[in-house]
Amino acid sequence: MLPSQSPAIFTVSRLNQTVRLLLEHEMGQVWISGEISNFTQPASGHWYFTLKDDTAQVRCAMFRNSNRRVTFRPQHGQQVLVRANITLYEPRGDYQIIVESMQPAGEGLLQLKYEQLKAKLQAEGLFDLQYKKSLPSPAHCVGVITSKTGAALHDILHVLKRRDPSLPVIIYPTAVQGDDAPGQIVRAIELANQRNECDVLIVGRGGGSLEDLWSFNDERVARAIFASRIPIVSAVGHETDVTIADFVADLRAPTPSAAAEVVSRNQQELLRQVQSTHQRLEMAMDYYLANRTRRFTQIHHRLQQQHPQLRLARQQTMLERLQKRMSFALESQLKRAGQQQQRLTRQLVQQNPQSRIHRAQTRIQQLEYRLAETLRAQLSATRERFGNAVTHLEAVSPLSTLARGYSVTSAADGAVLKQVKQVKVGETLTTRLGDGVVISEVSAVTKTRKSRKKTSNP
């Protein structure tokens, strides 16, 4: 006889479905470690096996789309770490797990720790771009934190010597593998910051397995990189190796050699820049001289077209002022060119390309000498043209004619007298001599002719 309030009654199908939904929704995705047994792979390509430990076991399935990403062939008795979803196979009521990924137990546990630390540091903001420091350009001193016997150090030094042989390098030797490595790497970073000898650091090592590179997945190393005041370039392993240090560093280089490329400057490129600057300086000086020559020609042309001495004096004053301005401008230009040459010389001395620097300095000295000679020649020619113009103007001036003993007589109305018929007896005349003026009154007018003379008395 059933009770008055009947409990819920499940069919077998509904029961299995309810249990499956509870397992999938409540448990979600989990990580499981265990030993493989009863491994089979039918023609479908799916994997079926059992995971067990000392006291229990569970059935597992890994479908073809997932197992083709596994890089090894599972073996009976092998310890593995799997990421899986818990479910229930409803037709038989079998509880099982659906595996999404599989790794050997050693690397798998490390990978799990890696993912957990990555998520933790990312949540704290250690990977944020706002905290990334810019690398110096150019670097004046590079620090290298790596093993002093490893291939990574050899690769870094080889690239730096090839690209920028005068760049100072300070090595902070440290272990990069083993239990003591994280602590040594942290101390090396702190030491580099205390000494403050370098303006960029390369932290890294050569390639290896996940266990070999694990020192650079250590939380202490990550936090030391983040706390460094000096920008850090991480260079761990090969391009496919990505560590926690890569995420925290200010820049990740795929290899140690690539890191050396990033922090160094190409000496050949610097020489090309110097040559380009020198060429632009020559062009600027040529343009400046042509412009000033054109200006002198215009001034000389205007002086030739203007006669009065007052205007001539003003033009002379203007010319002198322009000459002073030009001299000042040229001196300033030469001074700036000299300062630029000194800066370029210092840079070249730092890079130690002595022979090219010597040739560049010799060329600049030749240009300076040619420039000075050209300016002196043009100034001398301008002064000579100016003197000739003054002499010509003085030669045709009426005042010069008077100075030679001639005189000019004008009537009372100012008209210059050319014939005696313009003069009347008793009229007042003005005669201009070389050194003054004579005022006279006409008492008689005589006109000279070949046959006779005419005389009139007042």
UniProtKB/Swiss-Prot annotation:
Any GO BP: DNA catabolic process
Highest taxon, organism lineage: Bacteria
Top-level enzyme category: hydrolase
InterPro entries in alphabetical order: Exonuc_VII_L, Exonuc_VII_lsu_C, OB-fold_nuc-bd_dom
Subcellular location field: Cytoplasm
Reaction(s) this enzyme catalyzes, per UniProt: Exonucleolytic cleavage in either 5'- to 3'- or 3'- to 5'-direction to yield nucleoside 5'-phosphates
Transmembrane domains' residue ranges: none
Family annotation (Pfam families): Exonuc_VII_L (PF02601), tRNA_anti_2 (PF13742)
GO cellular component: cytoplasm; exodeoxyribonuclease VII complex
EC number per UniProt: 3.1.11.6
GO MF term list: exodeoxyribonuclease VII activity; nucleic acid binding
Entry keyword set: Cytoplasm, Exonuclease, Hydrolase, Nuclease
Family: Belongs to the XseA family.
Physiological role: Bidirectionally degrades single-stranded DNA into large acid-insoluble oligonucleotides, which are then degraded further into small acid-soluble oligonucleotides.
HAMAP family linked: Exonuc_7_L (MF_00378)
Subunit description: Heterooligomer composed of large and small subunits.
PANTHER family, alphabetized: EXODEOXYRIBONUCLEASE 7 LARGE SUBUNIT (PTHR30008:SF0)
Name assigned to this protein: Exodeoxyribonuclease 7 large subunit
Species for this entry: Escherichia coli O1:K1 / APEC
